[in-house]
A protein has these predicted regions:
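Canonical Radical SAM [4Fe-4S] cluster-binding loop centered on the CxxxCxxC motif
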Residues: 14-15, 21-65
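Solvent-exposed alpha-helices and their adjacent loops that cap or buttress functional pockets
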Residues: 12, 28-30, 81, 137
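Short, well-ordered coil loops that connect the C-terminus of an alpha-helix to the N-terminus
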Residues: 44, 48, 83, 162, ...
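Short glycine-enriched, charge-decorated loop/helix-capping segments at active-site entrances
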Residues: 53-61, 157-163, 231-240
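Extended, non-globular alpha-helical segments
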Residues: 59-77
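Auxiliary Fe-S-binding modules of radical SAM enzymes
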Residues: 1-28, 182, 187-269
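Conserved AdoMet/S-adenosylmethionine-binding subsite of the radical SAM
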Residues: 71-79, 83-86, 91, 95-222, ...
């Protein structure tokens, strides 16, 4: 009861988050044109990460910003969003700052803004205490972009340094509550493109009842320079992006083209 009263008294506009950066005209992280907020902090160490500068939750690597401040910046671009665009929060791993997410999306929804969460879901916990906050977040979230790095747990540890148990649990939970989801898988030659694993991932996604879109994201090297700047060895040096044939193979094995519900949704922002 006391906790509920405290939550009710919070001025969401003054809630702060560690923001790494923003992008004004995102065109690939959700429907339409979107304002992207990249939050600081991530516990994964994906070998192909293009934002390794977002890993550490250190003040000197980010800006401490209020919800009102972020929204004020976002609203400058609202005229470009049309009826499909809105705000996407990514990272780093956005769920590490779930209180900021709840505050930002709550205020955004009051303004009629479409809210998308881009997450790998590693922080997810299927416990009553965590779900209380997660459900509160989902109540003001229109769409989740869920990154599934690898279906094979041992290979997932190699790719990210972490297990995928919480990620798959989150996928199932989102299915249970009927939250619209786009599944995303980064295709890295020799790392995340093994046929057997792709088939298993396709089977897993088929068990979910809420998948509007299933995206294959071909590996690219645009973030490699950041690893060099940070003095971190880049394990994928020399690895080329997947060929068109390998991308086509992955799409066919996982039947990604069968997920078309995203084309039927129109969002009013």
């Amino acid at each position: 009861m006391v906790e509920e009263k405290i939550e009710e008294a919070v001025d969401y506009g003054k809630v702060t988050g560690m923001v790494h950066s923003t992008e004004s005209f995102g065109a690939v992280d959700g429907p339409g044109i979107r304002f992207i907020v990249f939050l600081q902090g991530c516990h994964m160490r994906c070998q192909y990460c293009h934002n390794p500068d977002t890993w550490e939750m250190e003040p000197n690597k980010s800006q401490l910003r209020t919800v009102d401040d972020v929204l004020q910046e976002a609203l400058r671009y609202k005229g470009f969003w049309g009826n499909k665009g809105g705000i996407t929060v990514s990272g780093g791993e956005a769920l590490l700052q779930i209180d900021f997410l709840i505050a930002l999306f709550t205020k955004a929804k009051e303004l009629g803004i479409h809210c998308t969460l881009d997450t790998c879901a590693l922080p997810f916990r299927n416990t009553p205490r965590y779900l209380k906050k997660f459900d509160k977040l989902m109540a003001v979230t229109d769409l989740v972009l869920l990154d599934i790095k690898e279906i094979n747990e041992e290979q997932h540890k190699i790719v990210t340094s972490q297990t995928n148990k919480n990620i798959l649990a989150c996928a199932k939970y989102l299915s249970d509550i009927g939250k619209p989801v786009w599944i995303r898988h980064v295709l890295v030659p020799g790392l995340t493109d093994r046929d057997d694993d792709l088939i298993e991932l396709g089977k897993f996604v088929k068990t979910l009842k809420n998948v509007d879109k299933f995206e294959i994201l071909p590996y690219h090297t645009m973030g490699e320079f950041k690893w060099r700047e940070l003095g971190i060895p880049y394990k994928l040096e020399g690895v080329k992006p997947p060929t068109a044939d390998r991308v086509k193979n992955a799409k066919e094995l996982m039947q990604t083209e069968s997920y078309t519900e995203y084309m039927n949704r129109v969002h009013n922002s």
